[in-house]
A protein has these predicted regions:
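SAM-dependent methyltransferase catalytic region
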Residues: 1-133, 137, 150-177
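C-terminal substrate-recognition regions of SAM-dependent nucleic acid methyltransferases
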Residues: 42, 95-97, 114, 139, ...
Length: 293
């Protein structure tokens, strides 16, 4: 196990308390001993791999001692429900020499998942990101539903990184091209990664500069609009005049005239289309007045 070193036995798990089966299952690996010349020279020039994709819950059932060790040893193992591949990235980085490079194929779920935040922070802080080749929904491995990317990291800090989006896997395999963009490394942070290439990348970056953002207005949104009585509060506009609106009430199956200040346009999820909203005559009754202190 390349993630677990001999210090596993020196701390909470002395050899005397583990039988042969336990030792074989945990299978510690001593990088300093097995690659002594390389490690004494500063580390590896290159680390290349396809780390395992295993949820920590599975490892907890199989080898809980290892899970506890990882939590104490690695920053990327601090989140509760992480996937083991994020720890392999941290370990791979630590094995590089000052000019070393890492290249992994791995799921891109950590770009947005909560458990990926420690790894995103680690990469952002060191400005390690060199290149991402994002396969989106394309299935690279036959017979396995995994959504992957190629990620390349440098041990030394970078000023820019390259992002490529692959929409046609067969074409990419033949000619190695896709939509590409060169981006400043300042785009990499511990928040969710939302990189985009080509014309879409320019638009996304422009939208990112627009303020205020929703996160600036509120910390969290736990639930959308809820009336608890839609048939009463959601009505249909029939006619509008300057000082009154004629509405139809589904609850009463009747029409009424109401003051415009009590009614507001209501948009539901199904009304939103790319770059536009479907016009509806749906209104919501809001019989309250907002007052300031």
């Amino acid at each position: 196990n390349s993630l677990i070193g001999p210090d596993f036995y020196w701390t909470a798990h002395p050899l005397d308390f583990l039988d042969d089966n336990d030792r074989a299952r945990i299978n510690v690996f001593d990088w300093q001993k097995e690659f002594s010349e390389i490690m004494e020279a500063g580390g590896f020039d290159t680390v290349i791999g396809n780390p395992p994709y295993i949820r920590i819950q599975v490892m907890q059932e199989w080898t809980p001692e290892s899970v506890e060790y990882l939590k104490q040893k690695y920053r990327t193992a601090q989140s509760g429900n992480y996937d083991i591949y994020v720890v392999f990235v941290e370990r791979g980085l630590s094995l590089l020499n000052k000019g070393g490079q890492l290249g992994f194929i791995l799921p891109h779920k950590f770009f947005n998942a909560q458990y990926g935040e420690p790894l995103r922070r680690l990469i952002a802080k060191g400005k390690h990101l060199t290149e991402v080749v994002h396969f989106g929904h394309q299935q690279v491995f036959a017979g396995a539903s995994t959504y992957t990317c190629l990620m390349f990291l440098d041990r030394t800090a970078r000023d820019t990184f390259r992002f490529a989006k692959v929409d046609d896997l067969d074409q990419w395999r033949r000619v190695g091209t896709g939509d590409e963009s060169e981006m400043p490394v300042t785009r990499v942070n511990s928040a969710e990664w939302a990189f985009s290439a080509g014309k879409g990348g320019t638009l996304l970056e422009k939208l990112g500069r627009i303020t205020p953002k929703l996160e600036d207005v509120t910390d969290r949104i736990f639930q959308g609009l809820k009336t608890s009585a839609d048939k009463i509060y959601i009505v249909e506009e029939k006619e509008r005049r300057k000082d009154c609106v004629r509405i139809f009430s589904p609850e009463k199956q009747a029409e009424y005239w109401l003051e415009p200040d009590l009614l507001h346009p209501l948009v539901k999820g199904g009304d939103s289309k790319p770059y536009s909203l479907t016009r509806t005559n749906r209104l919501i009754l809001f019989p309250y007045a907002k007052q300031t202190d």
